[in-house]
Amino acid sequence: ELAKKAGAKGIRFYGICCSGLSAMYRYAGVIPLSNAVSAELVLGTGALDLWIADVQDVFPSIMEVAKCFQTTVITTSESARLPGAERFEYDHHHSNIGETRELAERIVKRAIESFENRKGVPVYIPPYEVDAEVGFSVEYVHKRFGSMAPLAEAVKSGKILGIVNMVGCNNP
């Protein structure tokens, strides 16, 4: 409701990086866009109103790209502190887990404020999409297909053109 009052169609959540992204995609509808190595490219579309970094890898250059597109950057952990980012403290060891809902509400409100402040910022979203199956492991392939054989056959026959291994924590 708050987002619609601000003129937005709604709120969408996207994921960039590693920790838990496949589970967030599969069970919570968080759409994966990239890993940390190409995160600046995603931010460079101008389409993101708020960028939040928790304990995952994030490069300091993200702040320079965010400035170009007036994107708000929030960090929630000691390991992802960035000069110029807003700080919303959350302990990944769960000492303040009781504050999770309140923190999430603050972040959503801040995203809506950022949306309002960014009106007029140029946005370029490439005109294509790619269907992908993400977050699979050997165990997942066995559960989904019964064995590795159907996957191997689909690759050999050309039904699947390739497999991309986009893993987290591949940063230098």
Predicted regions and their residues:
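Metallocofactor- and cofactor-centric catalytic cores in central/energy metabolism, strongly enriched
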Residues: E1-P172
